[in-house]
């Protein structure tokens, strides 16, 4: 398994279709933001879309961004759009994305990363 940044990938159209195929409305929203070129406007210029992949399969994805859905706020950065495809759930694969975000945050000198959800007991 490998964690990659969507915007560093040569397979962007492939990964976009995988994100779009998720059974979650926020996945569709993320795909729309990517497709219409407004992702960075929505979440910040330094944002990343992290993908956990195995070959050409997308296992999990999330964002690491300056802004999320709670605005206005001084809190930053945010982990958002956290999703694991159903067939991969229960194996803690998304933890690999969390570890990558923790690594990026440490490199940036950021002591905390925030996550927002309206789901109870999901994370």
Regions found by a protein language model. Give the residues of each.
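Short amphipathic alpha-helix that is part of the acyltransferase structural core
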Residues: 1-38
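Residue-level preference for hydrophobic side chains embedded in well-ordered alpha helices
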Residues: 15-19, 79, 97
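Conserved beta-strand in the GNAT
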Residues: 51, 57-67, 78, 83
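Conserved acetyl-CoA-binding loop-helix of GNAT-fold acetyltransferases
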Residues: 81-84, 90-103
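Conserved GNAT acetyl-CoA-binding A-motif
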Residues: 105-117
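Conserved active-site tyrosine of GNAT-family acetyltransferases
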Residues: 123
